Design a protein with these regions (language model features):
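Conserved alpha/beta-hydrolase "acid-adjacent" motif
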Residues: 144-150
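Conserved alpha/beta-hydrolase catalytic His-Asp/Glu region
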Residues: 54-60, 72-130
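Short beta-strand immediately N-terminal to the catalytic nucleophile in serine-hydrolase-like folds
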Residues: 20-22, 47, 138
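Active-site-adjacent alpha-helix of alpha/beta-hydrolase-fold enzymes
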Residues: 152-161
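Short beta-strand/loop motif that positions the catalytic acidic residue
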Residues: 131, 137-139, 143
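Flexible "cap/lid" loop of the alpha/beta hydrolase fold
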Residues: 31-78, 82-84
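Catalytic active-site module of serine/aspartate enzymes centered on a nucleophile-bearing elbow/loop
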Residues: 161-196
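Active-site loop/oxyanion-hole signature of alpha/beta-hydrolase fold enzymes
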Residues: 1-21, 27, 32-37, 183, ...
Length: 196
């Protein structure tokens, strides 16, 4: 996937500053892009993501999730949506439906391919220690997928990183706290563009 994203940026001239931001699996893709850099990158934002590889004990759970998604996609979307949402999101009918609609739209085949890619993602912890860029690592205090310690460790490993913990947020920060996230991102983008 990282190669595909690099190819999509081929027409972006070297005079343009490049900042990468990745949410969840997108963070893994951004890290893989930095592991095989094709041009200079000035900034990185990791949102609900980490540099850790998938844990071996997660493999059986992921295989069950893959089977469930392949067998009954609508039911899988309901189950995974309930798991990922905080109680606040579940209690808001419009927000709950928006999240479920986006999950449904991803489709079973794409979601299964993403789960398989997540299972085999490389350990990027040593790579990020050598990054010389302005980084922002954002974690949700109630994220059921990404341990706070993993996200904090990524921020501590990157020399010029800032860690932001969003209280009450789960894994779905872009849906659950979009305004707060937008403010963080704007601040990071402005700072990065002004410093590089």
């Amino acid at each position: 996937m990282a190669g595909r994203v690099w190819r999509s940026l081929v027409d972006v001239g070297p005079e343009r500053k490049l900042l990468l931001a990745g949410f969840s699996m997108g963070g893994y893709v951004a890290l893989q892009m930095l592991a095989m850099p094709l041009r200079n990158v000035e900034g990185l934002a990791l949102l609900c993501s980490s540099a850790h590889p998938d844990q071996p004990e997660a493999a059986p759970l992921r295989e069950r999730a893959i089977s469930a998604a392949a067998r009954d996609w609508p039911r899988y979307v309901e189950k995974i949506g309930e798991f990922l949402m905080t109680a606040v999101a579940r209690a808001d009918p419009a927000l709950r439906e928006a999240i479920l609609a986006d999950l449904r739209e991803a489709g079973a085949d794409s979601t299964i391919a993403q789960m398989r890619a997540v299972m085999t993602r490389p350990d990027q912890r040593s790579m990020i220690a050598g990054l010389m860029l302005n980084a922002l690592v954002v974690a949700g205090s109630d994220d059921p997928l990404i341990p706070i310690d993993d996200a904090r460790a990524a921020a501590q490993a990157i020399p010029q990183a800032r860690f932001e913990l969003m209280p009450g947020a789960g894994h779905l920060i872009p849906w659950e706290q979009p305004q707060a996230l937008a403010m963080l991102m704007r601040s990071w983008i402005t700072q990065t563009l002004n410093e590089t």
